[in-house]
């Protein structure tokens, strides 16, 4: 989807709106971390004799000359081989070349951005990998973006008919259908198009939703409507993914399953380093490199 021209100008209470968004993202982070630790405790299948994992939080600040920072929350456990749930709130100025690519930045290079980003790589190949992020960005305009997508690592489960796929799609559809400012069909198609490895001519996973530059008019509800939808995307993810994990994490797997998982993880690496918009944005704006690249899986194999 082509980047739209967004209206220039900010509401008088933009600082209060920034605070509300930041508080939401950080609260969602804490909710998800607690939920994932509960999954670590509940495991009864393979590897249940190992200690359950716990998140380790690490706060970071941007280097001198830039503003803001964030928190990395990483866990390595018996359910999640590697999972990161990160929040950040940063501000500064875009470089001249990057300003031309960002709505509202040509007029003024200053920006503010806050959001949550999550990628989970489970131990059990029967449990699909997942990605979710939502964010608010302010330049001389303002907008929300984000989404969630599911990546089954076993080819027999990587279909639209699979029960995990249907459950995930339904959760995202409900989150969209409940808000007039959202367009489920467009966001689903955008996700399919975005999470596609062009050099391999194949999708990364089974999709989900993806949206960006959400800036509704005041007649349509404005910032409040956009924020309400973005919150429901986070709530939908926090509800549906633990259900999918619980339905799969006690199943047995084979060495062949593990090999397939590691090869599929390689597709994650390729996408994140070649195409991922969040990775590019973070590196271009002086973000925390350790946090940005923590989305990469811990063990990968290429055939």
UniProtKB/Swiss-Prot annotation:
Active site: 131
Gene Ontology process terms (BP): protoporphyrinogen IX biosynthetic process
Keyword Oxidoreductase on entry: yes
Pfam families: Coprogen_oxidas
Cofactor(s) the protein requires to work: a divalent metal cation
Pathway(s) served: Porphyrin-containing compound metabolism; protoporphyrin-IX biosynthesis; protoporphyrinogen-IX from coproporphyrinogen-III (O2 route): step 1/1
Subunit details: Homodimer.
Name of the featured protein: Oxygen-dependent coproporphyrinogen-III oxidase
